[in-house]
Amino acid sequence: MQVDTRPDTMSNIASYYNVKSKTLQRHYKHKVSGFKEWNQASHAEDYLIYPENITENLSIDEVSLSKGELYTFVTNKNKGVKNKKCVVAIINGTEAKVIQQVLEKIESEKRLVVKEVSMDMARNMGLAVKNSFQNSKMVIDRFHVVRLVMDAMQHMRVSLRWAAIKEENIAIKQAKDNKQKYIALVLSNGDTLRELLARSRYLLYKSESDWTVNQAKRASILFEKYPLLKTAYKLTLEFRAIYKNISKIKALEQFNEWKTKIIASNIEEFNTVVNSLEYHLDNILNFFDNRSTNANAESFNSKIKGFRANLRGVTDVNFFLFRLEKLFA
């Protein structure tokens, strides 16, 4: 049935068949779907498990299903059509102990099959995976690692912007007190200082070779005004380049070289990043064994969010989970 295979609203599917949406939903939910006889209904609000979908390579991530409540999703890296049979577990909550208790409901033999689990840097995920999949190694997703470094650079930019706004507000007040009209300093590209810092956000995410002419001009002015931000930008590019390596040993060497530069730069935000990365370093370096990422989990989460958005929110959580099972498990 289309409802079982399409992550769409009942109203959209009903309009396709030219029937009333409420009639279709009532008929599907109570007559043909099997929802009333669902074998996981008694514990659906707490967890759902699908041991038959376990493979050697898994991903674990969290997603908000309803009213901001977070659920933990364990999925395989099934590349089949529309992520069919990709869900291994759906767990209400993100607490390590709760995740572990649910995963341990899957028989030990199946859990020992798992060789690799990719994830973000969340400590709770790491603890749950370590205790539940004892034969597996954990791989921290490169996207989350690089984003942490880039966030540190952007934090510097935002702090500088707020400082520029504060200085401008003081200057405006002084001009007003002196019964003068405040005229902001306009830079050579037409930006004021606060505008320069606001409009530089996206160029800092890009490599120099990808800048437009206007972005290159803006970057030149930005780095002339704020040389420490230029240093942070260069350090960010160097860190991203580490992931071009195919050797774990070479990647570690480059990380240590990068760390030395961070210490020398004495940039507070980057010192904090180094401490975080060192805590997770072994799992970060595991990426270079098979270059595994959490991209499939992020893609799957996007599909769930899109499905939820189509429904304009989730009113019946159990029925929503039931439909997720039909679609993806």
Task: List the predicted regions and their residue ranges.
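RNase H-like nuclease fold core
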Residues: 26-118, 123-128
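Short, basic interhelical loop/turn and adjoining N-cap
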Residues: 9-29
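Short, surface-exposed amphipathic charged segments that create phosphate/polyanion-binding patches used
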Residues: 150-162
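Acidic/histidine-rich catalytic cores and adjacent linkers
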Residues: 67-68, 79-84, 100-101, 109-134, ...
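Inter-helix linker motif
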Residues: 135-151
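Short, amphipathic alpha-helical "recognition" segments used to contact nucleic acids or chromatin
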Residues: 1-8
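Residue-level marker of motif borders
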Residues: 56, 137-139, 293
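A structural signal for short, well-ordered beta-strand segments and their strand-loop junctions
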Residues: 13-14, 59, 116-118, 138-140
